[in-house]
């Protein structure tokens, strides 16, 4: 993509929007087990924030921000999605039974988590990897 160098307002706005969308996507990812949201919606927002940077700058700038190979990210997501339900077997429970646990935060109250967060993380990685692989393959052909 040939981008003009005088897109200063677009580039500045894209950086601000990038961080806002990432924070909102992260909050939806964490809230997904009890309220609407989760890995799919969070993954779409993460990918859309990277698409905003790609549109405002170019693919090389987006690769500097996220140097991951998105095809590998799809594989990581699938490993999390497969390993989470299988892990319940190793804990002596039925397939896909979620286990609850608390993460102690020394000064603050402990955070209550379930293993569904790991499954949602796998969905998030798979969605981001898929969307960005499609966007990059379309963008590199131009």
UniProtKB/Swiss-Prot annotation:
It comes from Staphylococcus aureus (strain bovine RF122 / ET3-1). Its main location: membrane. GO terms for cellular component: plasma membrane. GO terms for biological process: proton transmembrane transport; sodium ion transport. Keywords: Antiport, Cell membrane, Hydrogen ion transport, Ion transport, Membrane, Sodium, Sodium transport, Transmembrane, Transmembrane helix, Transport. Mnh complex is a Na(+)/H(+) antiporter involved in Na(+) excretion. It is found in: Cell membrane. PANTHER family: NA(+)/H(+) ANTIPORTER SUBUNIT B, NA(+)_H(+) ANTIPORTER SUBUNIT B. InterPro entries: CPA3_antiporter_subunitB, CPA3_sub_B, MnhB. It comes from the Bacteria. It is a multi-pass membrane protein. The chain crosses the membrane at residues 12-32, 37-57, 72-92, 116-136. This is Na(+)/H(+) antiporter subunit B1. Belongs to the CPA3 antiporters (TC 2.A.63) subunit B family. May form a heterooligomeric complex that consists of seven subunits: mnhA1, mnhB1, mnhC1, mnhD1, mnhE1, mnhF1 and mnhG1.
């Amino acid at each position: 993509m040939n981008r003009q160098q005088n897109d200063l307002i677009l580039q500045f706005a894209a950086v601000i929007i990038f961080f806002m969308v990432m924070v909102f996507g992260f909050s939806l990812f964490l809230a997904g087990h009890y309220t609407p949201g989760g890995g799919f919606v969070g993954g779409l927002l993460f990918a859309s924030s990277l698409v905003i940077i790609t549109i405002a700058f170019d693919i090389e700038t987006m690769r500097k921000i996220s140097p991951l190979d998105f095809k590998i990210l799809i594989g990581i997501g699938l490993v999390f999605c497969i390993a989470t339900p299988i892990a319940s077997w190793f804990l002596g429970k039925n397939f896909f039974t979620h286990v609850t646990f608390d993460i102690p935060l020394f000064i603050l109250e402990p955070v209550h988590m379930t293993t569904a967060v790991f499954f949602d993380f796998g969905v998030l990685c798979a969605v981001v990897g898929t969307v960005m692989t499609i966007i990059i393959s379309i963008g590199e052909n131009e």
